[in-house]
Amino acid sequence: MIETASLPEDQRPLAPPDSHIFRTFVNAPAGLRRYRAMTKFIREESHVPPRLREMALIQIGYVTSCVYEYTHHIKTGLASGVSADDLRAIADETDGIETSLEPLAKAVLRATREITLGFDVSADVFATLQRELGDEQLMELLFSVVTYVGTVKLLLTLRVELEERYQTYLQQFPIRPIRS
C-alpha cells in the first residue's frame, strides 16, 4: 500500500489517504483510472435500482468472506435503501433459509451467488431477471456483479486491509460460516 504523499502530484487524487483499496490499486495508475470509471458508471449511471445493486455487491462480499467488499457495501447499501432486515436476509438466503424478500431480490442474490461461486447463471434465474429487469438493466446488473467479483479477487489476493472505521459494520452484521 502506497502512502499518498509519496505519489506524483497528478496521482494523489487517485489514492486518498483514508482508502486502502485505492492506495493499493494506484500501483497501476492507468488501470485504476479505468477501474474507477467503470465503478462510477455502476454507482451513478446504471439503471439497476440502487438497493438491488448494493444487495448484489454485499452478497459477493458475504459469500466470499471478503470483509473489505462486504463492509464497504453495507455502508453504501444502507444509504441506498438496503435495510438491516435485507442484510440479515442476504445471510439467510445464502444459507438456504426462506426469507420475506421479494422474488426479484431473491433472484438477484441467487444469480450473484451463482456467478461468484461458478461461471454462469441458471436458466430459470436468468429468465426471471430478464423478465423483471429487461435487457438493459440485466446487462448492467451483470456488469456490476462481474466487476465486483474481480474486485474481490484483487482485494483478497493483495490482502487489502479493512479500514478501522468499517469494523462497526462487521460487528453489526457478521459473516456467518457458509453452510455447504
Where are these regions (language model features)?
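Hydrophobic alpha-helical segments
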Residues: M1-S180
